[in-house]
């Protein structure tokens, strides 16, 4: 792409995320919303697992469709708008006489159908519109925007929700109205981006059967390694999505205001991390930095498990917020590079499906594991799994050298 188009896209990718971050900050209280609607631990875990089921079932068919579709822009825009409009249902849930917590799960379940379409276009799109030399800086800018905005918004929303707890559910309904408006502003900027047709080879015979997808997975050692390693690495944070609201609210008795502070501090740490990780990646390479950060990240789970104190957890959250960008920025760049341009849509579709399977299983086991060993022991166990996942990138390396990574798939 021309430099002017790249610059324009980078600008819009940062601006749209500002508005999307405000919406995300509001929706981050969805688990607390379900708990206050009377949802059980199992219902809270379904918020994550239901979305994972939909994405797991639909991503590969949509990715196969996108692999043979050069003009993916209409699919991108329409799926994004549909997804965001479907969140209107959250506003009206309190008017239901029964099954209100369950209704939230149903809404999020259905909303993830357009998300699956969106992701099959959005993820490979970055490789098409942003040169690899500029991706780390772009992802850093997006992450800083996301972190700074969510830090302020989550803290403000948490304080506001806590200021008049008796206003429930009206305060949450207003919160989701704000989220809807902000998400529409984000969508408008996405529609202004310059997105070229994706590379396809219409003359090539592509086997999209299960056997063909298995061959795609096994023939590329780097691709299969990053998929397996990432699956194990992410079990802990996936389970934590459902576990942390239960652990913080029901066990440690965290308030809405504390949750807002926690979200804000975690995102504040991400801002700091995004300021220094890209420079280290330019000096030492994506893979080395990702591996180091992945191993270090296990300390968060050990810390909040062995020190169940809400004030101390805020300090630990600042730390993990700083560490996570070192994993996320490097990992996405590596993943894009190990997938060939012509097969990138389907390869990423398979990757996302495997990850959603892990997300679903990780979320569903939270409730029975809490009943079996208790939330505190479960948090510590997740720390062990996170450590194992980080070490896999050492014993089962994705690439042998940074030079090989930069040459891959280009």
Could you describe each region identified by the protein language model?
Residues 74-89, 288-303, 383:
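Structural signature of the two symmetry-related core transmembrane helices
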Residues 92-108, 305-317:
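Helix-loop junctions at membrane interfaces in 12-TM secondary transporters
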Residues 1-6, 196-228, 410:
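Juxtamembrane intracellular "pre-TM" segments in multi-pass secondary transporters
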Residues 32, 36, 64-67, 91-96, ...:
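Transmembrane alpha-helix termini and helix-breaking/packing motifs in multi-pass membrane transporters
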Residues 58-71, 161, 273-285, 370-371:
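Helix-to-loop junctions at the C-terminal end of transmembrane segments
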Residues 1-57, 66, 77, 88, ...:
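Helix-loop boundary and gating motifs at the non-cytosolic
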Residues 172, 187-204, 394-406:
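Helix-loop junctions on the cytosolic side of multi-pass membrane transporters
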Residues 116-130, 326-339:
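Intracellular juxtamembrane helix-capping segments at the cytosolic ends
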